[in-house]
Amino acid sequence: MVTMEELREMDCSVLKRLMNRDENGGGGSAGGNGSGSHGALGLLSGGKCLLLDCRPFLAHSAGYIRGSVNVRCNTIVRRRAKGSVSLEQILPAEEEVRARLRSGLYSAVIVYDERSPRAESLREDSTVSLVVQALRRNAERTDICLLKGGYERFSSEYPEFCSKTKALAAIPPPVPPSTNESLDLGCSSCGTPLHDQGGPVEILPFLYLGSAYHAARRDMLDALGITALLNVSSDCPNHFEGHYQYKCIPVEDNHKADISSWFMEAIEYIDAVKDCRGRVLVHCQAGISRSATICLAYLMMKKRVRLEEAFEFVKQRRSIISPNFSFMGQLLQFESQVLTTSCAAEAASPSGPLRERGKATPTPTSQFVFSFPVSVGVHAAPSNLPYLHSPITTSPSC
């Protein structure tokens, strides 16, 4: 068990004052009263603190305390760790955070879960306990505090300091094109297809998923702050090349297509847009199969989550996603590569040459080598269906 001597506690009101101080650029002590809170505040007043969200990825994505970093401690990590995790395992994509922890540059780390009221209530095998143990071994000079009541209490008392996933604002219906416009926006006299209704959906603050119709609506793109588009098709036009950055991945939506050979290139493109503080719309024709596959691969790679978890996360935002069976097979292979090689990859350099599309690399030259089968046994699709339904999809209507 994590004892009181090993883990200090912090009241939600203290964290709120600390966040106020940081937002106001303030130095000096924020003051504080109450058992345990005053001592924790004294620890944090002299430098920057780190917030670690110890909840699952889906919970963190639905809502989190602003500025927090989500740790990775899923079932795969726990099974491999056998009760002892490293910073590379719980913070695989946060190289700078790991370096700052090891250098003692954080005055304190505040960990929180969903609702743990006290340190003594933590289970020995809980994520918080495993994270605290990793911090004790790798960041000995850093003090650690548990946020009392966790995210549930803090978000209830101070929602203004939390970020939550919210529905996109309603986007006005399309304006009929003028006689000088030749864009085919995909509308018919019988109404807008299901996959074109509404607007693009936010997967992450910098990553959106939609259809070719959405990519042809400049009003939608501007309203969302889109700066770049990733066109996952061989036939969808790039309508506004003078206004947005474009990248094309010419993949067909059929069981012979090798979309996995594009995963790393797509992930690097999305990251490049994010690093420039931009936003990217990933689209194909319908925003159902090819572009959804790219978004799933991105989540699996960057968030180190399993396909099932990534699929649920994306489907909550765009219910009609349905990668074809071959793409699902390639994603499962990708999951295996990401999760089974992550221990070695987490300690390796994030850069390295990509394997040539369509060719296997016999000798590893980078942290990941993807050599996926491009033919997965499937039954022929009925001629009236434009895509194959995912085996995870519960019904064709989804």
From Swiss-Prot:
Molecular function per GO: MAP kinase serine/threonine phosphatase activity; MAP kinase tyrosine/serine/threonine phosphatase activity; phosphatase activity; protein tyrosine phosphatase activity; protein tyrosine/threonine phosphatase activity
EC number in record: 3.1.3.16, 3.1.3.48
GO cellular component: nucleoplasm; nucleus
Active site residues according to the UniProt entry: 284 (phosphocysteine intermediate)
Cysteine disulfide links: none
PROSITE patterns referenced in this protein's UniProt entry, alphabetically: RHODANESE_3 (PS50206), TYR_PHOSPHATASE_1 (PS00383), TYR_PHOSPHATASE_2 (PS50056), TYR_PHOSPHATASE_DUAL (PS50054)
GO terms for biological process, alphabetical: dephosphorylation; negative regulation of ERK1 and ERK2 cascade
Protein name: Dual specificity protein phosphatase 4
Protein species of origin: Mus musculus (Mouse)
Gene designation per UniProt: Dusp4
